Amino acid sequence: MARYRGPVEKLERRFGISLALKGERRLAGKCALDKRPYGPGQHGQKRGKISEYGLQLREKQKAKIMYGVSEKQFRALFKEANRQEGNTGENLVRIIEQRLDNVVYRMGFATTRRFARQLVTHGHILVNGKRVDIPSYMVKPGQKIEVKEKSKNNPQVIRAIDLTSQTGIVPWVDVDKEKKFGIFTRFPQREEVVIPIEERLIVELYSK
């Protein structure tokens, strides 16, 4: 399955939860899910019983959509998580949180991961002073993530910083909002990552 590029609010209504796909509307409480907390379509309000496999597949789809990754990318992330020592599910969450587009989002330079990905691919982001335009780049502890000098007055970046000031920044990054840079200080602990994903079900799905 390729990366989803259609109407994102329909996806949130289908899953019945916020996937942080509409940043400014979400923060303002104007998402379609807030007004119509049921699935889209004629039979959207009827949620049938889902099989065990269906639940597992649903969790994988939620994670892929939330982080904006393709099936190929997600499978590669899982293989790496499974290769490492420790809990595979927790490894998966930690690894996917290391993606550059996600770190840009977590630092508050973008209201959505989709916009963060655009900032990266269009060359607006520096890692340790060098331009990196690969969203899947794995950020390591101690690395400095910065909005390029010419892009620091980008209205969308400024707006994102203003909006994310309301919600706070995750504890595994330090951010200087005025200078528009941040440090990825450490790997996040699973309990710190607040996402509506049960990674255990994803591990079960890929382990079949």
Curated annotation (Swiss-Prot):
CC terms in the record's Gene Ontology section: small ribosomal subunit
GO MF terms held by the record: rRNA binding; structural constituent of ribosome
Domain S4 RNA-binding per the UniProt entry, residue ranges: 98-161
CDD domains (alphabetical): S4
One Gene Ontology term from the biological process aspect of the record: translation
Domain of life: Bacteria
Matching SMART domains: Ribosomal_S4, S4
Keywords of this entry: Ribonucleoprotein, Ribosomal protein, RNA-binding, rRNA-binding
Stored InterPro entries: Ribosomal_uS4, Ribosomal_uS4_bac-type, Ribosomal_uS4_CS, Ribosomal_uS4_N, S4_RNA-bd, S4_RNA-bd_sf
Record-stated family: Belongs to the universal ribosomal protein uS4 family.
PANTHER family given in the database record: 30S 40S RIBOSOMAL PROTEIN (PTHR11831), SMALL RIBOSOMAL SUBUNIT PROTEIN US4M (PTHR11831:SF4)
Subunit structure comment from the entry: Part of the 30S ribosomal subunit. Contacts protein S5. The interaction surface between S4 and S5 is involved in control of translational fidelity.
Function: One of the primary rRNA binding proteins, it binds directly to 16S rRNA where it nucleates assembly of the body of the 30S subunit. With S5 and S12 plays an important role in translational accuracy.
Protein name from the UniProt record: Small ribosomal subunit protein uS4
Native organism: Helicobacter hepaticus (strain ATCC 51449 / 3B1)
Phylogenetic placement of the source organism: Bacteria, Pseudomonadati, Campylobacterota, Epsilonproteobacteria, Campylobacterales
